[in-house]
């Protein structure tokens, strides 16, 4: 349960949500991403109060405006890296040529052009997370929500993933909201927001 949360995130900002288990981090992330609806209040993103959208409108809004990155990658094991990244585009009505060009672009961006035909089982954890980041980017969303994106990675690989997220913010102008338990990961963001028992207790610059 979240209580009287007031949080402003600027376009092109990298925000880390921190707090103990059960503090409301994932709940807040789900609300921001339009997965859950609040019982009261507003969630305004890009001038749209997504709390007022119908389920169908919300699904369309998510598909066009939000990219998701998860701790355990959530890649389909029977699909290649290329096909995993292409999945969100199958809902957009783009033709095959446009889809393939876009997938090639984002795989190049995350440094995996040479792994496009590999299956998840043939990729390291860091490579799988890069595929997941490419999938999050392929529809060119303004907002990216990341739930413990380095939680299943070793320190060095985690740093590489965080550097990539930083690149998305500073070079592409993406907005990233990231849940993490790791203070070092949170320090890579521009701002840290601390939650306890559903209450926003502190905000501070990460640097």
Language model features with spans:
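ABC family nucleotide-binding domain
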Residues: 1-195
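H-loop (His-switch) and adjacent beta-strand-loop-beta switch element
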Residues: 192-204
